[in-house]
Design a protein with these regions (language model features):
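N-terminal donor/sugar-recognition subdomains of glycan-related enzymes
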Residues: 1-156
């Protein structure tokens, strides 16, 4: 499983997971300096409590490289703060919510709801901040470049 993440998401600065599992994967992923933050949403807080007695995550938690959120306790404001802060907002285009293990598939309703809330919040934050002026200038440049072709070769 670690090889999959190292192949696909080696340079991703933010990773999102549903479920904490045994925590060993997170310990390994946090060895990669490119991963600035790993956000874990967990429904069963007892799993985290048990794993904290086995593995030490104190440095990762203090530096906020590992963020564990109990998704049943999150309010709308929590989602907004997470999605609008750096680097989460900056890398919102590469957002995905990954399951920690097959065990968490039985929580598919919660996962879909969480994914929907996060996607909606990212969308709202993006719309609130507006488009990047570089995108608008690129669109104008492409329009002007293609204008002679559109005038001389109409599609109808």
């Amino acid at each position: 499983m670690l090889n999959t993440y190292n192949d696909k998401y080696l340079l991703y600065p933010v990773l999102y997971f549903y479920g904490f599992g045994n925590g060993i994967l997170f310990k390994a992923l946090l060895q990669n300096k490119n991963h600035q933050h790993i956000v874990v949403f967990e429904k069963d807080i007892e799993i985290i409590w048990i794993m904290f007695h086995i593995l030490d995550f104190s440095n990762e938690l203090q530096s906020a490289r590992l963020m564990i959120l109990e998704n049943d306790k999150l309010q709308a404001q929590d989602y907004t703060e997470l999605c609008s802060s750096k680097p989460f907002f900056q890398f919102s285009r590469i957002y995905f919510l990954e399951l920690m293990s097959h065990y968490y598939e039985r929580f598919h309703e919660d996962i879909l709801g969480l994914n929907k809330k996060l996607a909606e919040n990212f969308k709202n934050i993006i719309l609130r901040n507006g488009n990047d002026p570089k995108d608008a200038l690129q669109g104008i440049e492409q329009f002007v470049y293609n204008l002679p072709q559109m005038i001389t070769h109409p599609s109808y």
